[in-house]
Amino acid sequence: MPIYIDRRLNPKDKSLGNRQRFLKRAREELKRTIKEQVRAGKITDVDAEHRVPMPARGTSEPTFRPDRSSGERGYILPGNKEFAPGDRLPKPGASGGEGGTGAGRGGSDDDFQFVLSREEVLDLFFEDLELPDMVKLNLKEAVAYRPRRAGFATSGSPTNINVGRTMRNSYGRRIALHRPKRQEVERLEAEIARLEVESDKLGGKQLEALRAELESLERKRRRIPYVDPIDIRFNRFEQQPLPNASAVMFCLMDVSSSMGEREKDLAKRFFVLLHLFLKRRYERIDIVFIRHTHEAREVDEETFFYSTQSGGTVVSTALEEMQRIIAERYPSREWNIYAAQASDGDNIAGDSERCASMLRDELMQLCQYYAYVEIIDERETEIFGATDNGTSLWRAYRTVGDQWPNFQMTRIARPADIYPVFRKLFARQSASPTRR
């Protein structure tokens, strides 16, 4: 086991160990404050700035200092009108408020407040969460790449020359250096030819001047080439790595008539938190939204959260739709498949056992992780205190959880339960569950 020895020198009057412990305490205080604010407000408040108070006494790093309540210290104080030589002065207290008068007596420090940005809030909120078992057994060892346009370069293969950009640079350079145009040379040549025909004495002097000017123009044209090597530009390409381990999250929500506005609101809050978590922690992940009543269909994000459709309840239709989408677009040998389902547990007679059978025999063999959240009434928390009690869907899903350790289920009764339940389902694990 490797042993690390920190030989960094401490700064003056500081201790790196103390500073690290201080930063850890401050970070924990920020996380605790944000979680309390979100728990007391709306789940969507996570995706916003937060004004976080922190006690002023906790904003300074620990240092060694003399104890004012004990020991002897020598003072040299300025003169005043209140004390005479020989008077005994009381020692000031630890807060610095003792011995004062008026408004200064008994004072305390105000809380220090600052604003955390949206990115900082999300980083703290989802710091220790992750998708479980984010590994495929048959990941490709060689990383695949694809070329992507990345501007221009001054060197490269002749086949990648960008003619348009090269000629643009050439034209700009010729204008800046005042390269003589071909029309100017042709005009002088025509004038010289005309004077050579006349060949009089006056025309001879003018002819010499024109020939000298023509030679100067030709010399300048040779010195300033039409296309210079510095003008040439090549198309530049970067090799963009293709992701080997791709992930997809299926969000299954019951929107049947048995789900009241309260139940739907709790389910939507849970999925909003899940959506923020996935988009913040993972750059490349597909999210499939499925709503179901007596029939299920894949919808977009807007419809998933804001549609008012309702109807009967057949939970197995959502599992069938999920199974169909996996077969068409997400082969399990290439994708990490996750699912989160929210329902009130109400289901048509006989369908709960069918749902459990589909999960046990088919879907759980494809999924890395499956989370089931049941929305119950606050009064039912005491009735269904034992995990064996509950709706027919809950009891059927219990058999799935007994067989598959990567199947988790829990209940939500009030908005304050959402965040603890979310952390329970997606807490970072030291070891991933093994499939049976």
Curated annotation (Swiss-Prot):
Annotated Gly residues bias: 94-106
Chain spans, region Disordered: 53-110
Cited Pfam families: DUF444
Domain of life: Bacteria
Cross-referenced NCBIfam families: PRK05325.1-2, PRK05325.1-3
Family recorded in the similarity comment: Belongs to the UPF0229 family.
PANTHER family given in the database record: UPF0229 PROTEIN YEAH
Record-given protein name: UPF0229 protein Meso_0256
Organism listed in the record: Chelativorans sp. (strain BNC1)
